[in-house]
């Protein structure tokens, strides 16, 4: 029904369930938890997810506890012409950020996944391969997109080609592992 209303009628879907709470900006701001440091106590591991857009990277850092509870630690956007190396270098630098607890202890991002299913796919594969060679835990990710099939959190991984243009032709120069996620 929601798809029909949005796409066929061109109207905005409005959730009518009594379970849906509606908050204004002030109410949401009041509910936010504030910490005196980058990291709340209990975070043991940091991961990052990178979404590649046409003109930017959207990065979210999450902190994880022993029981898989997670906190959104920080979100940022890195703008630039992704055909050039500068935004990729800026992303690499950001992923080396040190985050701190209130008592001064520090934690770095342990690993990151990067969406490869949209813009700059081949460049993303190459960049991730370089990060792995530099010792980073870097994972190529793609969202599951087969209508009608059950969505699982993690699907079978696959091996994909990394290509380069050589003498005007796209040629396979390497391979990398791609993780399909739900």
Protein language model features and the residues they cover:
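Metal-dependent catalytic core segments for phosphate chemistry
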Residues: 13-18, 52-94
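Short alpha-helical segments and helix-capping/turn motifs at coil-helix boundaries
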Residues: 30-34, 44-47, 96-100, 121-127
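Active-site-proximal structural scaffolding
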Residues: 39-43, 52-54, 84-88, 105-106, ...
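An acidic- and aromatic-residue-enriched active-site/binding cleft used to recognize and process polar
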Residues: 52-55, 62-64, 112-119, 141-146
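Beta-sheet entry/capping signal
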Residues: 44-47, 56-60, 69-71, 106-113, ...
């Amino acid at each position: 029904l929601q798809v029909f209303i949005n796409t066929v009628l061109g109207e905005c879907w409005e959730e009518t369930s009594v379970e849906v709470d509606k908050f204004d900006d002030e109410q949401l701001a009041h509910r936010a938890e504030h910490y005196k440091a980058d990291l709340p106590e209990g975070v043991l591991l940091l991961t990052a997810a990178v979404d590649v857009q046409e003109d930017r990277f959207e990065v979210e850092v999450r902190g994880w506890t022993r029981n898989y509870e997670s906190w959104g630690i920080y979100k940022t956007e890195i703008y630039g012409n992704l055909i050039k190396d500068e935004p990729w270098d800026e992303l690499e630098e950001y992923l080396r950020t040190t985050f701190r607890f209130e008592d001064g202890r520090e934690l770095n991002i342990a690993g990151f996944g990067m969406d490869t299913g949209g813009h700059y796919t081949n460049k993303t594969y190459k960049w991730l391969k370089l990060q792995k060679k530099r010792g980073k835990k870097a994972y190529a990710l793609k969202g599951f997109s087969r209508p009608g099939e059950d969505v699982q959190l993690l699907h079978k991984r696959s091996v994909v080609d990394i290509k380069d243009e050589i003498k005007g032709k796209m040629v396979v120069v390497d391979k990398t592992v791609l993780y399909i996620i739900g």
